[in-house]
Amino acid sequence: MPAENHTTLTPDTPVRYLKGVGPKTAERFEKLGIVTLADLLCHYPRRYIDFTKPYSIAEAPTDVECVVRAEVFAKPGGRILPGGRRMERITAGDDVSSLEITWFNNPYAAQKLQLGQEYYFQGIVTGGMLRRQMVNPQVRTAEQIKASPFEAVYPQTEGLTSNAIAKCVRQLLPHAELLPDPLPPEMLAKYRLLSKADAVRAIHCPATEEQAYAARRRLIYEAVSYTHLRAHETDQYL
């Protein structure tokens, strides 16, 4: 059960009852207009990171977000910098080039990587062809990408990152049926639309680009139908 001390979940259950969401985090969610579980399920991603199309190190664009596939060549370890920050550094590479990867104040990120193992690093590549670098990237294995090839990127706020939002959303996805479906079954069948629950699960965690498209199509259709209904109701009162 994803909620703490709140055995019955409803769309109106406050988001603070989610595991790991304390009062301060709930306040940050509220800055995004997220107060209830329904609000969180309907906080849709603004884009996705596609881990299925990685670059080689040499071909990776610089100064923009991208995914690079590389093998861990060396793990020289970490050190403490002036001011108390801890720096961890590894060298990764492929058949042609090498990539220097650095993490600050995140020793576990480097320590969990295995020498000789291939990983997918998502971040911003800097430097020239002779020395390429990446700082604080996200890391995934091939097995993780097979299970979840697209990573949702959410609108965020200070103190509440997209990753933190994604963790909370994943808690709720098994309970997507909490949201009522405003579209009747005959309409879903006629226009070949996903159910509300399936669309919400797919928009947050699509397995393919086609699945993400189907989810967006359903949710856009719902929004347009709602707008038309409100316009019709307004006309009746004029």
Tell me the role of every PLM-derived stretch.
Residues D63-I80:
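Structural detector for short beta-strands of small beta-barrel domains
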